[in-house]
Amino acid sequence: MKRALAYIETIKELKPIQDADKIECATILGWELVVKKDEFKVGDLAVYCEIDSVLPEVPVFEFLRPKKFRIKTIKIRKQISQGIAFPLSIVKEVNPSFDIDKARIGDDLTEILGISKYELDNDIEEELQEKRSWIESYYGWLKWKIFRIKPVKTGSFPSYVPKTDETRVQKMEGLLFDKEGTACYIAEKCEGSSCTYIYRKLNGNWLSGLFGNKYCFLACSRNQIIYNSNKSSNKTHPICQIMTKYDLERKLIKLNKNIAIQGEIFGPKIQGNVYGLPEYQMRVFSIYDIDEKKYVDYESLWAITSELELNMVPVIQTNVPLINDIKYYVGLSNDKSKINSNILREGIVIRAMDSSFSFKSINPEYLLSQESKISKQQQQEEKPATFPRETVVNMSDEIRKGITLRRGLPTGGKRST
């Protein structure tokens, strides 16, 4: 199921911004964003577009062209703004067939408005997905030519294990109210790429053990199987390198439980290697019990991770009551990373001690710092190359000499008549 990026919600609150006459701060769900003054009233329905929404290139959104039509976390007059709000009439301008009279709170407008999700160019899914060494590629081609054995396709993420994803705290008002006081633990949300390692015993007759493994071990990215123990698979992917580094297949065979280890990998070429690490690392954030069809509790998570000689994500607090306060968790997310204290942490994940629910709070200051970094990189890429004047003069001399020599003349010479 795709993430809803644009939907109809009510304006919960409006408050002034210091030293600002033409703008004010609106609250939609748990999000705070800057809007034009007097454009909305409390209780109005509005079209809210989340951060990382990429709006279509249509005339009504032309003002977003300098931002490449992307909605980002920004700060205006010391007020952090996350998302953008439009009057309901905007939908009709983009999609004339839309019936405003039938609009209801919570309606997903992502497809109706033609909105897509922004993805980082260097995301591991884009940059490293299905990467193979030339030897593996040649071996696959050779098997096809000689034995007519087709190369193995990795396949989609297994349906019997939940994908690694967390909902932002700004959309969890109902849960905070219902579960207030529930014992939770809070862990750092690491910036990297999610990975899942699955061990599953295969049910079959006695012959199955003679002609193959009695188990299946899978290494997966967020959306795909990268490695399958029962097939010839790609081992050059960073997720496979982590598998080898921590000897995960052997350890999970020894553990002999139908489980999925889920974590975050980070290091060179992954999300810009924000922690400045020389090699890939993995931190475990959850373990899914395939037989019980649920995540294991905190005590079991800690015990299994220790038995497998793996590291958990940094844990900040344990056994603390859930607080019904979105702003509290947004504020708590703003701190230094425990992996590298020189950088801000991406955010936090709040999970019940029994793992019955979880959600994330992303650090707005971290998002702002990343946007600033990306903007500087783009400016450097777009900036034309310049040379000091003396370099240009020397280059001109070299070019002149080269032309003269190609004409068969001595340097600085004249053509004889």
Which positions does each model-derived feature cover?
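Core nucleotide-handling region used for phosphoryl-transfer chemistry
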Residues: M1-T417
